[in-house]
Amino acid sequence: MFAMVGLVLCGRVAQKVRAMRQPALPPVPLAYAFHLSPNCDDRPPDAVINCVVIHATVLNSVEETVQTFLNPAKKVSAHFVVGREGQVVQMVPVEKRAWHAGISELEGVPHVNDYSVGIEIVNRNDGKDPFTDAQYEAVAGIIRFLRARYALPDSRLVSHAAIALPAGRKSDPLGFDFARLCALAK
């Protein structure tokens, strides 16, 4: 039953993306839901996706995060949300710019939202709340999928803390094991 729902959702997403007249990626090959956040816009015409920013939600559930990203007054979103059990919710088509990085810079290039994919992982970001095995697997699956289309070396899988300006403005994702993620995402 869940697979059938996923196929229906994938079909609807594909139709919406084609309607935007942009080259569309096939749906992420994971069981996932899609809820289009209003908090996104077009990437600059010359933008090349070459970075993934990993976040911690500081919220307690996928549902709470989805509701936040669906609220236009919040003016925040990410491309994907990953729950504690590894469930994935896509909130913004990869071809669009999600609003996850804020004022940011990577290797001297500002406006990280322009050229990145944002992945939010449900976690309190207190350094004590562990990231689950299922979350690592799901995030790695998303990255493997993205790497089929975009050049995303391990050095371009970064934390929100690493790109936020001014330095120290963000701390997420505290306690996340990037070496483990890179090994799983090969």
Language-model features: locations:
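Basic/polar, cationic surfaces and motifs that engage anionic cell-wall
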Residues: 9, 13, 17-31, 122-186
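Short coil-to-beta-strand
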Residues: 110-121
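Short secondary-structure boundary micro-motifs
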Residues: 63-66, 113, 133, 146
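N-terminal catalytic cores of peptidoglycan-degrading enzymes
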Residues: 2-111
